[in-house]
Regions:
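Helix-turn-helix DNA-binding module
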Residues: 13, 139-154, 158-179
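Acidic, proline/glycine-rich intrinsically disordered inter-domain spacer in sigma factors
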Residues: 9, 112-143
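Sigma70-family region 2
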Residues: 23-24, 47-50, 61-78, 96-98
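Arg/Lys-rich amphipathic alpha helix in sigma70-family domain 2
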Residues: 72, 87-105, 197
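Hydrophobic-face residues of short alpha-helical interaction/recognition segments
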Residues: 41, 45, 70, 82, ...
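Amphipathic, Lys/Arg- and hydrophobic-enriched alpha-helical face
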Residues: 34-52, 69, 145, 151, ...
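C-terminal edge and immediately downstream basic/flexible tail or linker adjoining helix-turn-helix-like DNA-binding
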Residues: 2-11, 21, 102-104, 119-120, ...
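A short, charge-rich alpha-helical start-of-domain segment used by transcription regulators
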Residues: 19-41
C-alpha cells in the first residue's frame, strides 16, 4: 500500500509529539496531522460512499470530530483511530443520504491523489502504458464495491484497501472477530464474481488465477 511521504515521515519521526501538541490546542500541529492523513481518510470515505462530494463531507467531519475527541485518544495506532472516526462519519453520511436522496457522482482521480486498490488486484508489473487500463479498473472496483451491502463494503475497504488487520477492523466497527472474518470472506467472493464481468481489465495474474480455479 502506498502512503504519502509526509505520512511516512510523521509516523517515523514525530507523530506522538504532534498529537500531544494538538491535544493542548496547537492548531499547527493538528493541521500537520491533517495534511499527513487527508488522502487516506478521503480515499476510505470515497470507497465506502462511492460519491466524491459525500466523501469530502465525511473527511471534513472526520477531522472536526477527531480534533474534538483528541483527549479520548489513549495511544496505539493513530491511523486506526482515524479510520474508526471516518467509518463512523461515513455511516452518518449514509443515514443522511437515506433521508434526502442525492444524485450519485462518479468518483474520479483528476487531482492525481492515490487511489488504493485491494491487494488481491495489485499488479506489480504495471507500466506507464497501463495507466488507462488502471483507471478503468478503478471504476470497475468501485462499481463492485457499490454493489456490496454497506457492512460488507466497510470490511473490504478497511482490511483489503487500507490494510488493517482483523482485530483492528473488529475494534473499528465493534463486531466480533468471527463476524469480521465471515463478512470479509463473503465480500471477497462477491467482489471476485462481480469483477469477472470486467474480466478484460483485470491484471493478468488475477485472470490466470481464475482460470486455474483458485
Amino acid at each position: 500500500m502506498n502512503h504519502s511521504p509526509l505520512w511516512c515521515k510523521i509516523t517515523m519521526m514525530n507523530e506522538p509529539e504532534l498529537i500531544q501538541a494538538a491535544k493542548h490546542g496547537d492548531l499547527e500541529a493538528f493541521n500537520t496531522l491533517v495534511l499527513a492523513y487527508q488522502t487516506i481518510v478521503y480515499n476510505t470515505a470515497l470507497r465506502i460512499l462511492g460519491d466524491d462530494n459525500l466523501a469530502a463531507d465525511a473527511a471534513q467531519e472526520t477531522f472536526i470530530s477527531a480534533f474534538r475527541a483528541l483527549n479520548s485518544y489513549r495511544g496505539g495506532s493513530f491511523r486506526a483511530w482515524l479510520l474508526r472516526t471516518v467509518t463512523n462519519a461515513c455511516y452518518d453520511e449514509l443515514r443522511r443520504k437515506q433521508r434526502r436522496p442525492t444524485t450519485r457522482l462518479e468518483p474520479d482521480n483528476e487531482e492525481g491523489d492515490e487511489v488504493e486498490t485491494p491487494r488481491w488486484l495489485a499488479d506489480p508489473n504495471a507500466s506507464p502504458e497501463d495507466l488507462l487500463d488502471q483507471a478503468e479498473l478503478e471504476h470497475a472496483i468501485q462499481h463492485c464495491l457499490d454493489d456490496l451491502p454497506t457492512d460488507f463494503k466497510t470490511v473490504v475497504v478497511l482490511a483489503d484497501i487500507q490494510g488493517l488487520d482483523y482485530s483492528e477492523v473488529s475494534t473499528i466497527i465493534k463486531k466480533p472477530l468471527g463476524t469480521i472474518k465471515s463478512r470479509l470472506a463473503r465480500a471477497r467472493l462477491r467482489m471476485r464474481e462481480c469483477l469477472q464481468s470486467f474480466r478484460e481489465l483485470l491484471p493478468a495474474a488475477f485472470r490466470l488465477e481464475k482460470e486455474r480455479g483458485i
